[in-house]
Amino acid sequence: MPAAPGLTRVLTRYADGRSELSLDPDLRVFVADLVRPYGLPLREDLLAEGVGHAYEELAAGLLAEALGPDEPADVLIQAFDSPDIRPGAPTSLALSRSCAGTPTALALCDQGTAGAFAALRAALAYQRTGVARRAVVVLAEQTALHHRPPEPVTLPDRHCAVVLVCETLPGEELTVRQESGAAVGPDDSVGSVGSVGSVESVAEEVRRQAKALGEDAAVLLAAGLEVPGLDAVRVPAGQPFTGLWSALAERLPGWRAERRPVLLADFDPRLGVLSTLTLRAGPPS
C-alpha cells in the first residue's frame, strides 16, 4: 500500500501564570512600534503588571515530548493568532532548536482560526515534494494583548500550545481543505464556487464531507460552528485558536483504536473561511 503524509502525534499543554519576559522593558518598545502607525493605545496596566506567556517557553517542552532525539524534524511551522510577548528573534527559529534535526523554520500569523489549517497545508506540501520526511506544526495562544484593539477580539482563557507531527504512513489519508468563495481541492487547485459565507452553506459543506467519510466518522466542530442534524463533538468556547486541536489531541487515540475516520471543521466568520481536515487511518499495524 502506498505511503502518504499522515498525522502521527498530537499533543497539547496548558500553562498558567506568566513568563518573566512579560516584564521585559523591550516589550513596551516593541508593541509601541507595532501600533504607532495605527494610532492604537497601549495597555499600560498590563505592561506594568507583567502578563502573558512566551511561546517558546510554552511549546519547547512539548516539542521535546513529541519528538525523540532520533526523530529529526525537517520542517517546523509555528502558527498563532494572538501575538507572542517575546520581542526580538522569531519564535519559530528558537523552537527549531528544541527538537532534533535542523528544520526549516517558518511562522504564520494573522489568519484567524484558519491559520492552523493553513500551517498544516504548508507542512503537507513540503512532505509531498519530498523535501520533508517529518514536518512539525506548533500552534500557540496566550491570554494577553498589550494594546487596545481597533475592534473587539476574543482572547483565550488560558495559555496553550499544541504540537502536531506529520509523517509518511502506509495507507494514511490526510486532507486539509479551505474555502472562501473558492473551493480548494485535494490537490490544492482552486475552482470557483458559491460563497461559503452563509451559515446554511457552511453547514451543508460540513455535512457533505462527513457523509463522504461514512456513518462511523467522528466529527469534531470548533466552538461557534453549528451544523444541525450532524452527530458531532462540539468544542467548548474559551480557546479560539487551540481549542479544536486540544480536543483532537485528547480524542484521536481513542478514535484511532476504533478505526474511525475523522473530520475537523472550523469557520472563521471574520475572514469568511471554512477550514476542514479529514483523516483516514491506514491498515492496522
Annotated model-derived regions:
Residues V51-P69, S198-L213, L244-A247, R251:
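Short, well-ordered amphipathic alpha-helical segments that serve as non-catalytic structural scaffolds
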Residues H53-A100, G214-E226:
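Conserved beta-ketoacyl condensing-enzyme motif
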Residues L67-E71, A125-R134, T168-G171:
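Secondary-structure boundary elements
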Residues A79, V136-E141, L264-D268:
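Short beta-strand segments
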Residues P90-T102, Y126, V153, R280-P284:
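A glycine- and small-aliphatic-rich helix-loop capping segment at beta-alpha/alpha-beta transitions
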Residues R97-G101, A105-H146, P150:
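Internal, hydrophobic cores of structured domains that mediate oligomerization or house catalytic pockets
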Residues D110-R128, A217-S285:
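Claisen-condensing/thiolase-fold acyl-transfer catalytic domains that form or cleave C-C bonds
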